[in-house]
């Protein structure tokens, strides 16, 4: 068992000082946390620096913090930002370590059993181990995670009790160390030295911890005493440092000692016998035979190796839990007094709420047909109510908080002011009758000012027809939809900014996260047709596209004002009034964002995310054959570097770009 270091404090390193209403938001959130408030909401408009605000809160309250994002890409970006803000503290990354994952499943209609198949990303596995070991060693830890953090993980008490602690001068037999390493799932391999392995050379044992990627440990013995512990480069063997003490954490999160393993196996056998009786009494002889054969094989592997593929399905017995008890998760590795931040909570909370039911349905089929014991159902994600029980104090972060968050707290901390002084756009409603002719007049006004226009429609057909009609009128227009490939989409956006055309028509432009400061008008056609594309949140997000321009304006064409429209307009007007008052008080003149236009291939999936950029000196079709080959090699290198750096959005963009460029040859 190791002791957690609690004296470390968070230190925020930034050249920026809180500005606008950031200081007030920080102070209110900090007071809430220190005052013991269970839940708070940070309602921050796009572009107001919500991550910087949360970083200041973390520094002030000085609590271990878990930040949950709704996908790996966003988690990776937040991880990068927090690493920059807290270079001296432990900023960790915890997401699903599968590059590819096909869960175990059974389809009764075709009698098809699908075996679990997966590809584990070694780099992410290392980072997961780094996260759990940091949480057990120190207090100044920020873990950025995806929703996968609510899935079952090993017992943190067992995990910490299995830590092998080594000190210089400690009496220990070399073979005793080797046995201890094997017990915590390290593998001996004197040739292929990788994470989770060790090798032996006389009185020297070299250990490659699961949480590291470059430096291994060299433990030198003198008789039955540890004489020296050094850090070495795992590839070259070069000595990079020396230490007096080191803690070696298990190579897997599902680890248990021999005594617990035997007890777990006896419980598995008891459950197997009881389940076989049930299946045979129901005349399910095939299912009984299948279950007996599979389970006995797993038991034999656990006895001989201490591990088996799919051991997580027996986690209830390994952890000593009762039927129905929640599994251990990453949240159990945190001390009781931790801070939880839910980013983009209006998307993340529904994900957390829905995880359990989908997992349960698949596993129930495996149990019913004899592929797994009923205890496999307890290898699962947390239910929402179980997740809530783990929460000490929580901050929901969103520009458009969902109903769940609003039910949890009345404390809504607003962050409306942008550092640029830009306002939320003016919103106007006009009748649907004659909407196109009216829009054409507005477009001409914008073209005279060298500004651009977004038009959102409800259907792809309408977008195409409107594009054709505008072209007949001599307007320069293009349309954007999901069928357009990444490369073509980004070229369209670039051409819009360059003024090669003036109007971009789309169906769900907010999903593209388009950031074009030149856009001063957004026209929302058929705004009164209730649905996902015209919900309050979608409308607020769409209106936000015009908040990059000092003359930003939104026109909604509608014959009636729906509840969603009214709420979206009220919220936008409320924010605009706050921003105007602040600007007047501080003498700030809103200025359109000046953003360099490059010849580039880029994609930005949400408004708050940075653009992913690949620079091209000239159009691809104008390159020579050798230049094309060189470019593709360069992009492939950048793709691999981005993946290694966990910048998955960049890597995915580069992958798509490479495929499209190859197809364009």
Swiss-Prot record:
Keywords carried by this UniProt record: ATP-binding, Cytoplasm, DNA damage, DNA excision, DNA repair, Excision nuclease, Nucleotide-binding, SOS response
Positions bound to ATP: 44-51
Motif Beta-hairpin mapped to chain: 97-120
CDD domains on file: DEXHc_UvrB (cd17916), SF2_C_UvrB (cd18790)
InterPro entries reported in the protein's UniProt record: Helicase/UvrB_N, Helicase_ATP-bd, Helicase_C-like, P-loop_NTPase, UVR_dom, UVR_dom_sf, UvrB, UvrB_inter
Entry GO CC: cytoplasm; excinuclease repair complex
GO biological-process terms attached to the record: nucleotide-excision repair; SOS response
Domain annotation UVR: ranges: 629-664
Domain Helicase ATP-binding: 31-414
Free-text comment about domains: The beta-hairpin motif is involved in DNA binding.
Summary of subunit composition and partner proteins: Forms a heterotetramer with UvrA during the search for lesions. Interacts with UvrC in an incision complex.
Biological function: The UvrABC repair system catalyzes the recognition and processing of DNA lesions. A damage recognition complex composed of 2 UvrA and 2 UvrB subunits scans DNA for abnormalities. Upon binding of the UvrA(2)B(2) complex to a putative damaged site, the DNA wraps around one UvrB monomer. DNA wrap is dependent on ATP binding by UvrB and probably causes local melting of the DNA helix, facilitating insertion of UvrB beta-hairpin between the DNA strands. Then UvrB probes one DNA strand for the presence of a lesion.
NCBIfam families in the cross-refs: PRK05298.1, uvrb
Protein name: UvrABC system protein B
Native species: Enterococcus faecalis (strain ATCC 700802 / V583)
């Amino acid at each position: 068992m190791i002791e957690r270091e609690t004296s470390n404090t968070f230190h925020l390193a930034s050249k920026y000082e809180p500005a606008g209403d950031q200081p007030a938001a920080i102070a209110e959130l900090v007071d809430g946390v220190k005052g013991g408030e269970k839940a708070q909401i940070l309602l921050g408009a796009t572009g107001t620096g919500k991550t910087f605000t949360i970083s200041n809160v973390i520094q002030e309250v000085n609590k271990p913090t878990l930040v949950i994002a709704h996908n790996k890409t966003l988690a990776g970006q937040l991880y990068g930002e927090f690493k920059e803000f807290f270079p001296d503290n432990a900023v960790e990354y915890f997401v699903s370590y599968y590059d590819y994952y096909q869960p175990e499943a059974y389809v009764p209609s075709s009698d098809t059993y699908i075996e679990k198949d997966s590809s584990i990303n070694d780099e992410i596995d290392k980072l997961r181990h780094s996260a759990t070991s940091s949480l057990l060693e120190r207090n100044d830890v920020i873990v950025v995670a995806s929703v996968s953090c609510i899935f079952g993980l090993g017992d943190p008490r067992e995990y910490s009790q299995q830590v092998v602690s080594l000190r210089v001068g400690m009496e220990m037999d070399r073979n005793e160390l080797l046995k201890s390493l094997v017990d915590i799932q390290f593998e001996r391999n004197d040739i292929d030295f990788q994470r989770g392995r060790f090798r032996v050379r006389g009185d020297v044992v070299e250990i490659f911890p699961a949480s590291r990627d470059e430096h291994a440990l060299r433990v030198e013995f003198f008789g039955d005493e540890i004489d020296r512990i050094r850090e070495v480069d795992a590839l070259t063997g070069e000595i990079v440092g020396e230490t007096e003490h080191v803690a070696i954490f298990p190579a897997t999160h599902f680890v248990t000692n021999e005594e617990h393993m035997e007890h777990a196996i006896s419980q598995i056998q008891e459950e197997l016998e009881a389940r076989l009786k049930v299946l045979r009494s129901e005349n399910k002889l095939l299912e009984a035979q299948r279950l007996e054969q599979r389970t006995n094989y797993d038991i034999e592997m656990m006895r001989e190796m201490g591990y088996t593929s799919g051991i997580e399905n027996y986690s209830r017995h390994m952890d000593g839990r009762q039927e129905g008890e929640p599994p251990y998760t990453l949240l159990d590795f945190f001390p009781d007094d931790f801070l939880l931040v839910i980013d983009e909570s209006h998307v993340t909370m529904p994900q957390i709420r829905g995880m359990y039911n989908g997992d349960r349905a698949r596993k129930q089929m495996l149990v019913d047909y004899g592929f797994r014991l009923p205890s496999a159902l307890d290898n699962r994600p947390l239910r929402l109510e179980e997740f809530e029980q783990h929460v000490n104090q929580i901050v929901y972060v969103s520009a458009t908080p969902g109903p769940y968050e609003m039910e949890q707290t009345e404390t809504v901390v607003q962050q409306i002011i942008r550092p640029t002084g830009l306002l939320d756009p003016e919103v106007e409603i006009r009748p649907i009758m004659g909407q196109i002719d009216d829009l054409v007049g507005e477009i001409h006004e914008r073209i005279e000012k060298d500004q651009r226009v977004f038009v959102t429609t409800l259907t792809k057909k309408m977008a195409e027809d409107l594009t054709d009609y505008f072209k007949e009128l001599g307007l320069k227009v293009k349309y954007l939809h999901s069928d357009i490939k990444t490369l073509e989409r980004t070229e369209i956006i670039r051409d819009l900014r360059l003024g090669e055309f003036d109007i971009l028509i789309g169906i769900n432009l907010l999903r593209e996260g388009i950031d074009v400061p030149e856009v001063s008008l957004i026209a929302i056609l058929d705004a009164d047709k209730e649905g996902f594309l015209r919900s309050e949140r979608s409308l607020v997000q769409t209106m936000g596209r015009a908040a990059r321009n000092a003359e930003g304006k939104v026109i909604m064409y509608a014959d009636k004002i729906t509840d969603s429209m009214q709420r979206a307009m009220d919220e936008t007007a409320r924010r605009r009034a706050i921003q105007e008052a602040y600007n007047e008080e501080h003498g700030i003149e809103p200025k359109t964002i000046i953003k360099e236009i490059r010849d580039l291939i880029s994609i930005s999936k949400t408004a708050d995310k940075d653009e992913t950029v690949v620079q091209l000196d000239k159009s691809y079709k104008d390159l020579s054959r050798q230049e094309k080959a060189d470019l593709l090699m360069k992009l492939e290198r950048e793709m691999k570097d981005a993946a290694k750096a966990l910048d998955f959005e960049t890597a995915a963009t580069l992958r798509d770009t490479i495929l499209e460029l190859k197809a364009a040859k």
